Amino acid sequence: MAICLVLSRTGMEEETPRPGVIVISISDPGDPLPLEGWDKVFRFEFDDCEEREAVLAQVTRRRDGSFGKVVAFTEDMAKKIMKILEDHPTEDFIVHCNAGVSRSVAVGRFIGEETRRKVLFRGNCLSDVHANGLVLRLLHRQVWLRS
């Protein structure tokens, strides 16, 4: 049975590259994690925000201390994740974000629901209780639109 491992940025940095594993790398805008050695890495850059409409005009502080406009998860990103799942029906996945608690948990939970992969949470996250609602809603919307 294929798995989906969900972890934090720190957890991902500690992982040893494995052939055939699909990595969905979620980071804050402008702060991607270098992932040399992994075969297939799909990068998404968006902030951990819940409601798209409420945050589009807001500014957030980045890890490097700079400020930037909040970037929310979008329908286009959800479509890309759906395509990744379609293109890789049997491979193991690793999904990470900075904390490994909200964004990556939402994507990992969705992967488990839609593909019946076993989802394993490691590090900061022990369950999917803090899964990002906006990410889940837009991914589930893609399923609904395709049915």
PLM segments and residue spans:
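Cysteine-dependent PTP/DSP-like catalytic domain, specifically the C-terminal lobe
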Residues: 109, 115-147
